[in-house]
Amino acid sequence: MNGILLSIFLGGFSTIAGILFLFVGLAPFMIYGFSHIGAIVATIFGFLLVAFPILYKKKPLKIAKYLWIFTAIISTIAAGFCYYMSIFSYTNQYKLEEPPTVIVLGCQVKNGMPSVTLANRLNKAYEVLAKYPEANCIVSGGLTPGEPMSEAQVMSNYLVEKGIAADRILLEDKSTSTSENILFSKDIIIKNNLSQNIVIASDGYHQFRSAQIVKQYGFTPYCASSKSPTGLAPSYYVREFLALIYTFVLKA
């Protein structure tokens, strides 16, 4: 009897959790026609969870129970980290008396124009720059294959068109990752004697890992979190969880 009840409970919970993971993983492709590592992992995990009731029936109770415990532990850790990252981006918002240095983290561009995600980041950076007229901004992003100009140049053009003076904007156009965004921007900050109070203009899911990298270089990070397009944030939180493991555990 206990085995039957356990089977029903685990099967139902696993199916619901699996459907949620599948939705998170498939949403970027279904809505925007693309995918990424976080979405792929969420999709695979979702399939495994949905398949759990079938595996439970075919495997001995003890093995199925251990599989469930392992799945529950991984899910809890991942969910906890994702929740903490989301809270961090809102509790560490910029509130400064002195003008900071704003770093805009690059993202996809197409035909010399920013994607919706990148435009949202730039609009958030514009808000900070408008609030602090003496603040400088580093736009950070290299050249995407097939594009006529770097992400940094696209971002600079966008901000200038919105009214930000070109001499307030410094371009970092060599980076290909978040770590390089901040590493190469650090060199620009030191070379130009800019403020070491750093406001990161990026999506909320990006803020925690970016802040940890900024701290590694002795700077003080603050958040200016932009809104993520509908349906993208959950899968990107999964990607950030994986990136945190890679950056601070595997590469440590």
Give, region by region, the residue ranges found by the protein language model.
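Membrane-interfacial loop-to-transmembrane-helix junctions in polytopic alpha-helical membrane proteins
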Residues: 2, 6, 59-66, 111
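Short hydrophobic alpha-helical membrane-anchoring segments
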Residues: 20-28, 78-86, 248
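Hydrophobic alpha-helical transmembrane segments of polytopic
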Residues: 10-13, 67-74, 239
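A structural signal for short, hydrophobic/glycine-enriched beta-strand patches
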Residues: 68, 80-239
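Short, Lys/Arg-enriched, disordered terminal segments
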Residues: 1-9, 251-252
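A transmembrane-helix-recognition feature enriched in membrane-embedded lipid enzymes
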Residues: 234-252
